[in-house]
Amino acid sequence: MAGKRDKVRMISTAGTGHFYTTDKNKKNTPGKMEFSKYDPVVRKHVPYKEGKIK
């Protein structure tokens, strides 16, 4: 039986191509996640949006 959590890729909105990977419970958070994290390429905190893992 499949797990309840999906792996997702958090992609920087700064356009640097930097991303973090995490997982989310698709039952509790059905929408797209978005939060602020540190982007080492631009050396500041920027919003990261959820994307698919290829």
Swiss-Prot record:
Q: Which GO terms describe its molecular function?
A: structural constituent of ribosome
* UniProt record similarity statement: Belongs to the bacterial ribosomal protein bL33 family.
Q: Which domain of life is it from?
A: Bacteria
Q: What is this protein called?
A: Large ribosomal subunit protein bL33
Which Pfam families does the protein's record reference?
Ribosomal_L33
List UniProt keywords, sorted A-Z. Ribonucleoprotein, Ribosomal protein
Per the UniProt entry, what are the Gene Ontology biological process annotations, in alphabetical order?
A: translation
GO CC, any one term: cytosolic large ribosomal subunit
User: NCBIfam families given for it?
Assistant: PRK00595.1, rpmG_bact
Q: Which HAMAP family match?
A: Ribosomal_bL33 (MF_00294)
